[in-house]
């Protein structure tokens, strides 16, 4: 834009260098000078380029962002642009003392009342340090850290942002906008299967790609329009030239490359055989519905990877659609959520007509294979909605799933079931009379009927995760079959570890279904890990804005003490140390795999000047408000190049959540409260749900239920028992936080309906194997 070029010339180039130049285009003049700027000036230029988006553009981006919501794991953050003070007055020193007292109360509760951290020497040591440096009873003012404190910390700890210009609020806005646009571009690439060669995670053109993103629609060829004359700003159509290799042959090569075992190879070849049949004669081939299951650690994702290689070798990755029922499941296999891919909208009535863009419909009509992973979380009603949407997307209302040639469901029904729906394995109509059936039951039954069409079944059996430990492998088999013994119980109880021996210094992870125990364990773990590794500890109290009324110290303390859970993604207090593992609590950037349950390393923090740090101990600083953001990285972000950030990192910013007295967890509140903080927490301790799909060398387990009854944990859920025990690679690596009760282990198995359904799947798997081998 010419006005931008004038502005850039005026700001970054000596005027005498260009005022005499009366010829040529102003943009070309600026481009010539831009290439000569220093890296520091180019950093500011890129931020200004990103910030030039108008408010109207931002609203358009927000609408597009909303259209990418992920079903049950919806993006529950607004576009995180830090545009003001959120209506908060600066906190007084008296309020600081209230929150500090509340923090101490939380720590003392963990030491005295929590089964998980009772008597923790690590937390007792921290409490002692805080009392020594800042006695509550004296009420003296906190000593504020100097302005360059975190720069010094970065220097001492080799922080990722050391040497980078300090990021202002405007810089944060630019980074967030860049990440949001990159997320949408990546999501388009994942959903379409077409690699966009105009940018790459490690390429220097990322800034140009981001600056121009969303400035125009990408037209798709309409019915009757010649593909050659279709005008597109970005090339989105690939033409395959040369002979195609058969799917079966490429499947053999992929299986050899991935070293698939016999059952994995069968799962792959069943799909490849059908695809060869379909490409030879689409009209007579029909459709192929396949379920590939198996317990955790049997290598289901390797089948997906091999099938992905087959399509890549054919030059047709865009014909394969990979999805998961949750953001984390999708991210683990390189896909997107099925809600996003199929345009599922939890707010749309089933009676409303479906409407999709011609571009999205055109994309879906090309697809040969749809993969849906983590099928245990897929309810019957959602499966029916997927089929209904695909019928509309593919303009094929008379065939299941819109006539897509292959639908491949993956997952383990011994893992967690749908939260708000009923498992595909359950026929609800058997449990109620037809006269009393509601719309939800009807939708589920339609999905259940679709599920009954999946008669090609492969159950993977070879335990890859625990194959080096036959004793653990046999134990897991007995647990899945519900025949675990008292001898197994005695064996597990030899794994109980004394409280004084629990340390998180060397990579130990904990899994507990009880949120309160998780909060306490994570506080202990951060302090233990940070002090052992000589890392500074920063404590961020989330900002709380009360609607009205005078609050007691007890009410403030209970609010701070209530951490994150499934209904509140923001913790009351965040303990941070550079290099610690963190887990994300909500879907933020699905295209960049920043999703609910995804794990990252926290490599730096950007404090908010409005919430300065105060000295609590030589290695402990407290902030009475959230930071501007936390900088994270993982293997998934390697090579990612966001303007303004170190290569390979992504910034996560604060989110807001309303605490409502009507919610069971916040009944103690006298009025509503808005909490603002980071939607991430330390990942030393995880819930059983977020541990699903992860593997650890050493793990501390709590085989209990997920709520308290009469001051005792409820019975351990079978799914939790199965998932926790199968997270480790060896029996030696398993440690127990507390003894396993008989009620938690003996006769703990799936209910009869599920067992009967699993028996049917085993029969279908045997029949499938006979057909395949015959």
Role assignments for model-derived ranges:
Residues 229-774:
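RecA-like helicase/translocase P-loop NTPase motor core
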Residues 1-254, 290, 748, 758-765, ...:
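Intrinsic low-complexity, intrinsically disordered terminal tails and linker regions enriched
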